């Protein structure tokens, strides 16, 4: 299972990158926060008391190869690591794979990138009270 918290929540993007991938449940990663990295793409970092919401995808091996390519794993932009997330509204946890940014500098999103993230969050029906966190990054780091 893959935990998407950025633009890979966007159904149109995932249909293009990973045709046949199956959308799963909404999940929460406690004590982490969302940010836009210095390259202009989504990242997450540890922060006690915060949370990152996203969705799960069931992927086949060909999908993993495609995502590793798109996420720039070979170039050192992201690394794929295993983490534990909580299923939203349940006291159940699952081990999943997630891409972590190797760039922890805050930055300005690439053109239309954060809009695609927010659209994806709406498409997968993240809770509406989480959307302002994503929307706050549309023009760069919120103060």
What residue spans do the PLM features occupy?
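Glycine-aromatic micro-motifs
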Residues: 1-143
